[in-house]
Each structure stands twice: as C-alpha cells, then as structure tokens.
Amino acid sequence: MKKKTIITILILVLLCVTGGCYFGAKHVWLDGRILPTTVTEVTISGEKLPKIKTLERLDALELLDARKITLNAEQYEQLASALPGCHILWQVPIFGGYHDNIETEVVAASIQQPDITMLRYFPNLEKVDASACTDLAMVTALKAAWPELDVTYRAVLGDTELFQDTTELVFEGEDASELLAVIGYFPQLQKIDASGCGDYAALDQIRKDYPNLTITYNIFLGDQLWPFDTKTLLLKNADGEELQKVLPYFTVLQRVTLTGTVPDQETMYELMHAYPEVVFDWKFTVCGVETASTATELILSDIPMETVDAVEFSLKYFYDLQRVEMCQCGISNEEMDALGKRHPETRFVWSFPFGKGYLRTDETALIPFKYGYPFDNPCTDEQTKLLKYCTDMVVLDLGHMQMKDLSFLQYMPKLKYLILGDTRAADYSPVGYLTELIYLEVFWSDFKESDVLLKLTKLEDLNCAWAKLDRPEALYQMTWLKRLWATSVGIPSSELYKLKEALPNTQVFVHGKHPTDGGWRQAQNYYDMRDLLGMHYMQ
C-alpha cells in the first residue's frame, strides 16, 4: 500500500512539473502579471525596464507601450534590437522634457546639440515649434539637419517680433545691433523700415552685410531728417563734428552745399579728402576775396601781396580751379611763373609792364603798336623776352621791331599768325616750335633757316620775299601751302617755273617791288589776323 501510494504521488508530482513547465513555456511573468507569450500588445510601467530576455519571449508582440517608464536612447535601442518586429511607444527625452515618439508636433523651448540627434526617434514628426527658443543658432542647426520639418521660430526685439516667414519688418527700436545680431536667421526677410531708429552704424552694417535686403532709415543732420540714400545735402550753419560723425552713413552722397556759418577750413579740408566722391560746396576767403570750393576762376588782381603763400595754400580747397588772375599784385614774373609750374592744373595770369601799359600773360593777340611802340621806336629784347610768359598767344605781330632773341616763341604752342617782317633776329629757328602756324610773314628779314619751314606742315600763307634763305629749294617741298610770296629768295629767274611746277595747288607770287604786292593782304587768313588784333585792313 505504501509503495503504491508513493508511486501515485510521484506520478502526480511529475504531472505537475510537466504541466508547470508547459505553462511556463507558454507564459511570462511581466510587471506583476502573467501574460501568454502569444500576446500582441503590452503596456509596461514601473521604475525599471523589464528584463530584455523576458520581453524577447513575447514572440508575437506587435506593440509595446513603454511610455509609463523612463527610458534613455540606449535603452530604447536595446528594446528595438530585441523586438525587431515590434512597434515601441516611449517618452523621448528631448528639449528639456519628454515627448511621445508618435507626436507630429513638438515644442522646443530650448535646444541643445543632442536634441537635434534625438529627433530621429519621431517617425511621424512634422513640426517643431521653437518660438520660445532664443538660441537661433541652434534653431538653424536643427533646420539644416531636418530640412523636411516645419520649424517655427521668432526673435523678440523690444516690442517687435520677427518670425521665420516675415518678409517685411518695421523696426522701431533704438538699438539696431540687436537686429543685426539676428537678421541672418531670417532669410525670407526682404524689406526693413527703420525710419525711427537712430543707430546708424548698425543699420549701415546691415545694409553692407545684406545687399539684397531693402532697408530704409533716416539720418538726423542739421535739425532735419535725411534719407540715408540722399544724394544732395543743403545745410545751413552746419556743425563740423556732426558732419564728421554722420556723413559715413550716407551711402550715395554726391554733393554737400553749405551756407551760413561753415566749419573751419581745416575741418572742411579733412572732409574733402575723407570723401573724395562727394563735392563739398562751401565759401571761404582768399586774400580778402570771397570764393567757393567749386569755383573755376579766382580774381585777385590789384590786391597788393608780398608773397604767393596765401594763394598757394588756398589751392587745396578748390576742386577744379582752372584760372587765377593776379594782375598787378606786386609779385615778380619769376615767382608767378614758378607758381604756375608747381600747379600746372591751374592757369595763373598776371601782367607785366610793356610799353605804355601792362601786358597780361593770357593775351592772345599782340601788336606792339598798341602799347606805344611805333616803327621809329621799336621794342627790343628787353621787352620781348617777357613774352615767354604769354603762352596763350594766337596772333603776334612783331614786324619792324628790333629784337635779336626769338627764344620766347617756343613757349607759344597756340600761335597761328606770326609777323616777323623787316626784323634782324640772330636766330629764327624757334619758329620751328610753332606747329600750329597757318600764317607767316618773314619778308625783308634775316630769316635763313629754310629747314625750319618744313616743320610747319599746317602753314597756309607764307611770305618770305627778300628773306635770306640758306636753302631756297626747300620751298619746293612745301606742297601744303595755299599761298607763297617768294620774290628774290635766291631762286634764279630762269628756274622760277620749277617752283610753280612743284607747287601746282599753291598760289605762287615771285614778282613785285614790294613784299605785299600782288594782293598779299587780300586773303582770308590776313583778314582773320587783323580782326583778332583789332586793326584795320591794309593794302
């Protein structure tokens, strides 16, 4: 009996063990519950993550809701690796809090670099609201990492809000440096109206840094507001320090006209050189004469001076001073000439005693007769040597004068009409410098330099009758002449026909008892010359 009982007990124990093993194989103990291994959805909770091996036995599991426990990314990865076919719901630690990984929109009050990586655990995410985040650099990094997401953000500038999709902004703050610091994060911004802001430096920097952005602002100057893109300023009683402070912020300024009281000359000089693209139109005095920086002419004649220092010092205040008249100021010819050479861009005009009057160095037409030099009292080298200063001379009639030195002619590049008839100069070669000559009289003179004539290729009228040409055959080459009077120049009478043959298009006159016979003074160039001299026509 005892043996039979024992066997029965053993059988029962075996059955229990076998049944228990079978049950244990088909069920798991999870979170205080017995769950069949065939379960498809499970929610877990508690302070700790269940053992991974336990969860792995749930081979039919399709959904694991782990949102009631705290997981980190590493733990989630362990779960995902252990349950490859299971959809896991969990609270993702991100943006300083926790968010369901199935959310389509999350709020980011602050963003750290790890947060950007954690976004990969949101398969359904569409939007990130970062409106409360002040770190726009991190917002930009998030956008770059997840371009498919709709990221909203903003910048608060005093009472002004700037959103990511803002295209036009009215900025009324005082400190534009705040705007400068954030504007790069708002690529859709196209236009800024900062008319009420006085932070010119920051606004100007915005303009430079973002050339495709339209920005408007005003600059306060001279009790008036001026748009920064003003081209012309008209200011009365302007302050020099104020000008120096705000002028850098006028971007396309071309002209500043100053009236009333103006800054001192040195301040104006500094401004002129600091802004070479701007014309500063202002008035000042030179030797007691009021003038302007934009003046092209300065008249100082009849003002006694001991030196040219004051005049020369003032030249730097002019933009395009072309002419300065200083007639009878008491300055020597040498000093005036040196002044002009130091400043070739400006024509300096003065006068010197000549005969019964004064001859201006800008004279264009001269006949000594008008200055009291008749034939019986001709001027000499003492007077004519000063003609070298008359560089604008166009007409010069020195016929019958007694000068020997003609070197002054080389300083008359504009000379077109020259009369040296009945003269006895030692050297006529300076005539060769006069390449603009169209009319020349050297009759009854000691002119002998025939080759000089060949340099005068613009010459139209030549009267060399009774001149002492050293090589009269040179005349044969002057085919450009319109008229040639060449009586008794050394060409044999029997060969005069050759001269006419050589110059078929030239009126050649080789006869007569007087150099002007044959109608020499009946030609247009002669009339033009006498008109320029203000003299009557002679026969």
Model-derived features: positions:
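N-terminal Sec-pathway targeting helices
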Residues: M1-T18
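Membrane-interface motif at the C-terminal end of an N-terminal transmembrane signal
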Residues: V17-G32
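Concave beta-strand-loop units of leucine-rich repeat
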Residues: T37-K51, D59-E74, L83-M118, P123-A137, ...
